Amino acid sequence: MYNDIWSAYNNIFTRIGLDFRSIIADAGAMGGRESIEFIAISDVGEDTIAYSEESDYAANIEMASSKFKERTNTEVQLQKEVVDTPATTTIEDLASFLDVKESKILKSVLFVADGNKPILAIVRGDHEVNEIKVRMAVGAETIETASEAHIEDLFGNIPAGYVGPVDLSEEVTIVADLYVKNMVNSV
């Protein structure tokens, strides 16, 4: 039945000459892990999609994935060092203060899944955390950015921008983007 419906939409849009893609999309809390949507290709609109001209891959930006290439890093591993970073509340501030590229910084964002489960998501500093992908990675129904009060309950008097993956409570689940795997001597 699904294939018949998909074919019907595909045939209609093809017949009228619409430049379109069937894309991988988020089905939301009620719809399972993913769904397929038909999207017209346009310079305007409410959605951003990633697609390939060489294949039939297409997804909305929340569901898009890239091909991860593991790299052999020849950088010499330095000793871990504690550095005071006063008044650096953003990735941009930290990169400027330490004179490093944003891609060398680990960005950590704390979420609360299903109302009470702390999740720490980690990406490169020049990337953004995708809440939908975090929700799907931990199998949660709902996810939201942790409030200041929730952060204080878990970590004490640590500002949100200073929470990181070191010495965490076992109750915190850590989810990291694959690109973090290639990072050496990160901040």
Regions from the language model: what does each represent?
Residues 1-187:
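Extended, low-hydrophobicity, polar/charged segments
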